Amino acid sequence: MILQNVLHRPLRTLITAIAVAVEVTMVIMVVGLTSGLLLENAKRVEGVGADIMIQPPSASVFLAFSGAPMPIAIGEKLKELDYVQAVAPVLVQFNSVNGLDVVFGIDPASFTAVSNGFVFHSGHDLQNPNDILVDDIYAKAKKVKTGQSMHILDHDFHVAGVVEHGKGARLFVFLSTLQEMAGAHDKASIFYIKNDRTDHTPAVMDEVRQLLPRYEVRPLKDFISLMTSSNLPGLGAFINVMIGIAVVIGFLVIFLSMYTTVIERTREIGVLKSLGASKGYIVRIILSETTLLCLAGAIAGIGLSFLMRTVFIRLFPALSILITLNWVLRASAIAIIGGLLGASYPAWLASRKDPVEALAYE
């Protein structure tokens, strides 16, 4: 009976299910985009291969917001610490032309000592001041090839090579070049430290904190756990607002749909009540139909989310969208709960109808 009632009005059912699907897709995609970008950034930072990362006081864990540069002379003091094998200073800038990409200014020798060097798809390492390396994902997304010219940060660069992704940034230039462009002479945004043995990391971190008590000292093996929305000011609030908007959309659509349904089925409700149907039975019918609509919409929304992810990644290879079972279930639950709340008043209204008046309704 419930399924028949839902299918009896196919157009309204379709529109309602689409609205719920949009709600579910909106939640999954917003969370998937933010989570994917955070996780991808964390993996790139861990991929540098260092054991410890040092940033200026109060610097953000997100490299594009890494704070004021530090004196590069700090690197010489860090090299003197016990168990330290290599230290690589890095200056971080971000390029906002055609997207937002992190640019690393590196000293090739020290960066190679920490990261074991780049894996080249084509070309060669940095040799001239205007050389730039791009990773394979950036090259694919922007259609960049070795030997081409690039204009970023108001500067013309020569693409010296395309490297495997996962070394902290997508673009790499000489440290001295980026220092001059940024007006940050003898400065660095980050120091990466490679220890002689991984188990010496806690001891080295203690020494660094004694040497630089106000600086941010982070072990890179736990970096992924730090890349959450709560560590980026405003991101958690943004996600909650978007979820709230999605819930309101679902609530209003279900409310209007079920309210109209109750009005149209007034005589039917009168017949049921005249045959002895209880208020609880009427409420269960309305809420069961709502649940069925929300389930159909949720399933469609999940499918639409995976379809959109496939399309977006094909169109924008540098984009990362993480869809997890946890958020698929949460988005579905949000849609169903919001739908039931939206149907609560129409269900209550239906249960309160007087059978005599309902049967006389035209």
Protein language model features and the residues they cover:
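C-terminal membrane-exit region of the final transmembrane helix in multipass inner-membrane proteins
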Residues: 9, 324-362
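Hydrophobic, regular-secondary-structure patches
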Residues: 25-102, 206-210, 216
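Peri-transmembrane interface segments
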Residues: 41-44, 206-252, 261-266, 271-272, ...
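Transmembrane alpha-helical interface segments in multi-pass membrane proteins
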Residues: 246, 267-312, 330-334, 338, ...
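Hydrophobic alpha-helical transmembrane segments of multi-pass inner-membrane transport and secretion
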Residues: 10-37, 233-268, 291-300, 341
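Short helix-to-coil transition segments within interhelical loops
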Residues: 6, 262, 271-280, 353, ...
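Hydrophobic secondary-structure segments that place a key small or acidic residue at a functional site
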Residues: 90-91, 99-109, 118-177, 186-187
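A short beta-strand structural signal in non-transmembrane regions
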Residues: 52, 138-139, 160-165, 186-211, ...
